[in-house]
Every structure is written in structure tokens, then in C-alpha cells.
């Protein structure tokens, strides 16, 4: 019984260390970016990307890599985009050309969790800062 407990603890450590290392890639010194956004009706399903407000964006930023994830459906790809020669604190609505917005099922009367992940890149493409912002929404929010 004790052996199973130790194996379980080792497995948890490996899982957690994997989560930590994948958040900022290989650049452990990356800073933290604040990420905020609001989903509107026009951002749903295959609409346009929402405006995204960033704080603490490093002055050395030369580009951004942005992706949208659905925490309730990890395999779902909601796209995002790469913004080259970009270092502004506001990503305008519609700027993410690969965006496929959240499209919660009308038959499920619950809320879903969506995360925008933003990586700031320097002139060499190295990640110099990372941030993410989460919102929850359901179909009823957009009727």
C-alpha cells in the first residue's frame, strides 16, 4: 500500500513539473503579462477576435503569439494569431486572423472556461514575457 502511495506522489510531481515547464517554454526568466478581454456576441463561434488589453508588456517586445484555449475541451483549437512588429498594449478587435471563437453548445446549460495565452517575443523570436487571462461564459450570455 505504501508503495502505491509513493508511486502516486511521483506521478503527480512529474505531471506538475510538466505543466510548469510548458507555460513559458524554455525561457525561465520570462516576465508576466496581464491579459484582459471581454467576449461579446460578435466574438462567438467564427466571429472576430475580441479586443485584448495587455499590461506589463516589456519594452523590448517585437511581436506577440496569441492563442485561445477551451479548458473544458482541451482538444478544441480556437486558433489565435502571430502579430509581428507589434508592441502595443491593446490588441484591436479582429486582429487575430486565425481566431475561432468559443461556441458553447445551446443544449448544455453550463458555463465554459476560455483562456487567452499571450507570449511576448523579442527580435529573435525568444519569449520574453508570458501571460494568460481566463473568462467563463455560456450560450445564455450571448442571446
How would you label these PLM feature ranges?
Residues 2, 15-16, 26:
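Intrinsic low-complexity, intrinsically disordered segments enriched in polar/basic residues
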Residues 1-8:
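Bacterial N-terminal signal peptides that target proteins for export
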Residues 9-17:
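Bacterial N-terminal signal peptides
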Residues 19-143:
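N-terminus-centered regions that define maturation/targeting leaders and the start
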Amino acid at each position: 500500500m505504501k508503495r502505491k502511495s509513493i508511486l502516486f506522489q511521483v506521478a503527480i510531481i512529474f505531471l506538475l513539473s510538466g505543466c510548469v515547464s510548458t507555460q513559458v517554454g524554455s525561457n525561465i526568466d520570462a516576465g508576466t503579462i496581464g491579459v484582459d478581454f471581454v467576449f461579446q456576441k460578435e466574438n462567438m463561434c467564427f466571429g472576430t477576435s475580441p479586443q485584448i488589453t495587455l499590461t506589463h508588456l516589456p519594452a523590448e517586445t517585437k511581436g506577440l503569439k496569441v492563442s485561445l484555449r477551451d479548458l473544458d475541451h482541451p482538444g478544441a483549437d480556437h486558433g489565435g494569431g502571430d502579430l509581428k512588429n507589434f508592441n502595443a498594449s491593446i490588441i484591436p478587435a479582429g486582429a487575430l486572423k486565425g481566431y475561432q471563437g468559443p461556441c458553447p453548445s445551446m443544449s448544455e446549460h453550463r458555463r465554459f472556461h476560455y483562456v487567452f495565452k499571450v507570449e511576448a517575443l523579442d527580435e529573435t523570436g525568444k519569449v520574453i514575457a508570458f501571460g494568460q487571462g481566463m473568462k467563463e461564459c455560456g450560450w445564455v450570455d450571448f442571446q
